[in-house]
Amino acid sequence: MLGAKPHWLPGPLHSPGLPLVLVLLALGAGWAQEGSEPVLLEGECLVVCEPGRAAAGGPGGAALGEAPPGRVAFAAVRSHHHEPAGETGNGTSGAIYFDQVLVNEGGGFDRASGSFVAPVRGVYSFRFHVVKVYNRQTVQVSLMLNTWPVISAFANDPDVTREAATSSVLLPLDPGDRVSLRLRRGNLLGGWKYSSFSGFLIFPL
């Protein structure tokens, strides 16, 4: 403020060049180092953070009253070309299975069924890459949300030895929603090992 004069402390803390506000700041710093206690100045509480602790709502911290979002991600592939005897979906129209799980953070991917079950409500990203090898038939692969085909991809060039049906999508899911791949047309005999299926949680809702 214009014309305002600094206030000085009486006694031993009085110094011609030491304004009151600097003395209070110095005292507050000393109290914070000793006991990390709040500093009370004119009825306002100044919270002293603990050293090395992330501030709430800042980088590495969640907002007050909220838990950090869970980490959810999976990636699965085939370890061999042909379906083992006794498995369903052995090259004919049906569910596409993946027997080798590379990542399953959050435990949402079920290897037995080849499907992902959403553990939390949120927006998820999914990607699949399904290959046909030495196969002149058209292959159609659909990504299924429960029983609904969301997107489909095709591999239909008869003149190439290897071709992939590949696509990706973002989906809002509720807990318990199931996402899987289904072979809607053609067969994958000989090309299983080059196929993959992956997904992850982008953010919770």
From Swiss-Prot:
Note the superkingdom of the native organism.
Eukaryota
SMART domains given in the database record: C1Q (SM00110)
Query: Which positions does UniProt annotate with glycan attachment?
Result: N90
Q: What is its main location?
A: endoplasmic reticulum
Please list the residue ranges annotated as the C1q domain: 67-205
Q: Name one GO cellular component term.
A: parallel fiber to Purkinje cell synapse
Q: What role is this protein assigned?
A: May be involved in synaptic functions in the CNS.
Q: Return the Pfam families for the record.
A: C1q (PF00386)
Q: How does it assemble?
A: Heterohexamer; disulfide-linked heterotrimers. Interacts with CBLN1. May also form oligomers with CBLN2 and CBLN4.
Q: Tell me a GO biological process for this protein.
A: maintenance of synapse structure
Protein name per Swiss-Prot or TrEMBL = Cerebellin-3
Annotated PROSITE patterns: C1Q
The record's subcellular locations are: Endoplasmic reticulum; Golgi apparatus, cis-Golgi network; Secreted; Synapse
Mind listing the UniProt keywords for this protein, alphabetically?
A: Disulfide bond, Endoplasmic reticulum, Glycoprotein, Golgi apparatus, Secreted, Signal, Synapse
Gene3D superfamilies for this protein:
2.60.120.40
Stretch list, region Necessary for interaction with CBLN3, and homotrimerization = 72-205
According to the record, the signal peptide region is 1-32
